[in-house]
UniProtKB/Swiss-Prot annotation:
This is Autophagy-related protein 3. Residues 272-337 are annotated as: Handle region. It is found in: Cytoplasm. One of its GO terms (biological process) is cytoplasm to vacuole targeting by the Cvt pathway. The active site is at residue 268. It comes from the Eukaryota. It comes from Lodderomyces elongisporus (strain ATCC 11503 / CBS 2605 / JCM 1781 / NBRC 1676 / NRRL YB-4239) (Yeast). Transmembrane segments: none annotated. GO terms for cellular component: cytosol; mitochondrion; phagophore; phagophore assembly site. Keywords: Autophagy, Cytoplasm, Protein transport, Transport, Ubl conjugation pathway. Belongs to the ATG3 family. Monomer. Interacts with ATG8 through an intermediate thioester bond through the C-terminal Gly of ATG8. Also interacts with the 40 amino acid C-terminal region of the E1-like ATG7 enzyme. Also interacts with the ATG12-ATG5 conjugate.
């Protein structure tokens, strides 16, 4: 708990910054945190603002908006079970460079030290066991975004990745009785399956607070088993992706309650991840705006020529584009969406906790 106390001290000593620069740094001010929280609560009522004991309140936040909370979020399988299978997706090299800040791949490309996956533009990612054999078609954009997030988080790690493989056997009914007992045997088999599923069920209370030291949201997890008994930190770590649990997860006292142990997702790299995610979303909106304008223009018209000139101005490295990105426009991401995008990022760290239903807002 020494790290938890040091973190609390750092939060206390860091001065509050009220300047708004989330588009360029990925950081937000307390006022922007409240604004983004209001939007999250409005769009998704399972999230609610809450207060906390007076001695734990942050004076720069409203007393009734100290923390965002959603309760009893289900988790039916552990993280290592969620990523039982693997699949490969080919993505554009420019998108890889964008997600990595144009650093990792460019360096590897210059030195010729790419491994097989990097050389051919492949990224390996996990696949939910529930998706196996269903014939479901995956959305390439969604897969690409998740892979971008994985690459960003993995950059912060030191040493080699450790793979964890866990297999759990489940009991099955024999069903070998006489014909007049067949239905009863089937009922018992179904009961065993239901009981086995219930024993795996966990529920989480999720808390989002504002970190003054990093100027980003910070997520805390408090878990319970199927009987409502609080989970130990080691048990909660089972619901965090094994690639990240030793890199970004920390055992801390919940800062908005007394004597409550939680697991936090450390926010040291949140701002850089958020900056790249917002850049992706902004580029997508710019592309949609141009496509919409093209639909309204007739081929061969003077307006069409103007549209083509506009597309050229949107090319990478254009000074005019750089100036426009500094000014608010229809393609810019508003701060209201910050926490929605933040939860999209967190979903890759805690894949088995089923709270990532915010994607329709983007």
């Amino acid at each position: 708990m020494l790290r938890s106390k040091l973190s609390s001290l750092r939060e206390y000593l860091t001065p509050i910054n009220h300047n708004s620069n989330f588009l360029t740094t990925g950081e937000i001010s307390p006022e922007e945190f409240v604004k983004a929280g209001d939007y999250l609560v409005y769009k998704f009522p399972t999230w609610q603002w809450a207060s906390c004991p007076k001695d734990l309140q942050k004076l720069f936040l409203p007393t009734d908006k100290q923390v965002l909370v959603t309760r009893h979020v289900p988790s039916h399988q552990r993280a290592n079970e969620y990523f039982e299978g693997e699949f490969e997706v080919e993505i554009d090299e420019k998108d890889r460079d964008l997600a990595l800040g144009n650093e990792s791949n460019l360096k590897n490309g210059e030195n010729g030290e790419n491994d097989d996956e990097a050389e051919y533009g492949w990224i390996r990612s996990g696949r939910s066991s529930s998706e196996k054999g269903t014939g479901e078609v995956l959305d390439p954009q969604r897969v690409e975004e998740v892979n971008d997030i994985d690459e960003l988080i993995d950059e912060t790690a030191e040493g080699e990745e450790e793979e964890e493989e866990g297999e759990e056997g489940e009991g099955e009914g024999n069903g070998n009785g006489a014909d007049f007992h067949a239905d009863d045997d089937a009922d018992y088999d179904d009961l065993d399956i239901v009981q086995g599923s219930h024993s795996k069920l966990r529920r989480y209370d999720l808390y989002i607070t504002y970190s003054t030291s990093y100027r980003v949201p910070k997520l805390y997890l408090v878990g319970f088993d199927a009987n409502g008994i609080p989970l130990l930190p080691q048990q909660m770590f089972e619901d965090i992706n094994s690639d990240y649990k030793d890199k970004t997860a920390t055992i801390e006292q919940l800062p908005v309650a007394h004597n409550t142990t939680s697991v936090s997702i450390h926010p040291c790299k949140h701002s850089s991840v958020m900056r790249v995610l917002m850049k992706h979303q902004r580029a997508r909106r710019e592309h949609e705006n141009v496509a919409e304008n093209m639909k309204r223009l007739s081929i061969g018209s003077e307006d069409h020529k103007e549209a083509m000139n506009h597309i050229r101005r949107l090319s990478a490295g254009s000074k005019e584009l750089a100036q426009k990105q500094e000014e608010p426009n229809d393609s810019e991401i508003k701060v209201d969406l910050y926490l929605v995008i933040f939860l999209k990022f967190i979903a890759s760290v805690t894949p088995g906790i089923e709270y990532d239903y915010t994607m329709d807002a983007l």
